[in-house]
Amino acid sequence: MKLFLYIFLISFSFVSSQSKLKKDTNAIMKMCGCFDVTFNFSETINLNNRENYKPSEDYQTSPVYELAIPIKQDKNHISIQHILQVGDDNYRSIVKHWRQDWIYQNKNLYIYEKDNKWNYKNLNKTNYKGQWTQKVYQVDDSPRYEGSSSWVHVDGKSFWENTTPAPLPRREFSKRKDYNVLLRSNRHEITNYGWFHGQNNEKVDRINSIEEEVLAFEVGYNYYKRVANDKCKYAKEWWLENEKKWEIVRNIWAEIYSQNKNLSLKSEYNGKRLYEYLLFSNEYNDYSEIDKLISSFIIK
């Protein structure tokens, strides 16, 4: 009887975990598709006493189309490439945007410190069991931020929340020099219209691992409203023309990340940022050229 009960409990636990994993995977995949997207940010509370402190102005974008295309999908790893499609038939611009990788029960993290430095962290099993790591990458597939948490499915809602340090966002890094870390509290929630990316952020001036000052709070409301896939046809065409090059870029970065050691990057090399070489030049297309270019940005 005891043996039967033990086998039953083990079987029930396995079935339950597999059901939860399927719900998690379905939620992540619902972030794929063509979306009408708006980005909205506002600095809400000033926490510092700096005499000349100037808060950021509210940031709001007009709706744009964004293609979120799954470039890898298996049971424990989903990779989603985002591509912006801006403009209309008279003027159109395609922008390779961010990438998010979701890895189940991942133990390897790169945690942002400051000044383009990420510290490698190895999690023990109790800290990642049942969790998904979201790894977010810059437009050139260099690191941005990472965090591990559980997907929650309750009361008809599916969401994932995590707080982790990150570099300044693109909308701020060329304007603000008074803080160097954005402590991001992200919430990804699946909705009836698509999905929602909410943020409650802290703008941090970090001196070292002990000394830092929180200058202000910021909220972000990014809405991804699902539309017909053909609305993103130009973004998809661009990706089909360029995906082989970016597969090479990802593979080179994957080799770097697999070393599992701290990583420091130069902001520029010969006066240009990495994304400028990769996105705005036709010179870098094969493995050796791209590998040499990326290596020139790594501080050894």
Predicted regions and their residues:
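Amphipathic/hydrophobic helical signal segments and adjacent flexible N-terminal regions
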Residues: 18-28, 41-59, 75-82, 86, ...
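Generic short beta-strand segments
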Residues: 36-45, 83, 163-171, 198-206
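Short proline/glycine-enriched turn/loop segments at secondary-structure junctions
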Residues: 208-214
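A glycine-anchored, Pro-Gly-centered beta-turn/N-cap motif
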Residues: 31-33
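Sec-dependent N-terminal signal peptides
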Residues: 2-13
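Short helix-loop boundary/capping segments
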Residues: 125-183, 203-205
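Hydrophobic/aromatic beta-strand elements that line small-molecule binding cavities or substrate pockets
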Residues: 55-72, 81, 99-101, 183-190, ...
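Low-complexity, serine/threonine/proline-enriched polar segments
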Residues: 72-153
